């Protein structure tokens, strides 16, 4: 693949990154009842003989603190702060349920296996779902489960979300792929380069796929889709760190990449992009590079601990390596003086490194500030 391929300087310029505004609630095509109806519609003679057993559960959790969030993450649960069966009227990076008091952790939505053992954390099962990719019975037999899935979209009023919805011929499923890059006039000779090791997530309703970019920003999802998808960057990195805090109290910040087709998203982040997105990508690359170079063969220095948590504060100037999440003990009074109004969130999540981003605008200055605190 050519080094300058999959660059897109225009994609994402009109995407907003504030609070998500929900639209109408939609009928979930993956509910077992809806898959069963679609199956009966296409295969009326088999409907009574083929059981549509749940493969997954669409749920929401209400964790009280960091410990409960960590417990969910340790069990492999990927959390989102907004419901999956609503249209999104206005794109954004975060959502807070209006029934949950400001300052408390909002409902966290997820899709878990049907046999998931729930921890002692408040939860609700919203729907029992059937996702053909996750079922062993779809690997054999003479039922076209892709056609059943598509029919479920049609019968639930979601046909417009299918790729080539107006066509009479079903579109082939595609594994989304693309490239996420960043460019700055004073870095890499002004040429775009990859946003490295960051998680890319996409979904249509409760069907998700996740993967990580490589060093050059390329990614390919492990699942195939026929519907349009919502894409996002989750700043949790393969090098063992996460970039957190952006008005939503979860350990890894999210930057939406908006809605696009199943072929994938290419995006080149620039200094003209939304500032939080640009800064997160710059910090991501600085931490990725620094940790990569801590090996004996390179700088031969001790790498930062894994599960490192980096917070960005866009209205503060000072930075610090407080290392609270990794066990350092500091005076609460000193932290409150340093963080000011932000100190109240310490009851939920503990940072290791805080980066003050006020007036830190260029890729090189963000990169330098990050490496300084990591050292």
Q: Each PLM stretch: what is its role?
A:
Residues 1-133:
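Long, solvent-exposed N-terminal ectodomains/accessory regions
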Residues 2-3, 7, 22, 58, ...:
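Beta-strand-rich domain onsets/edges
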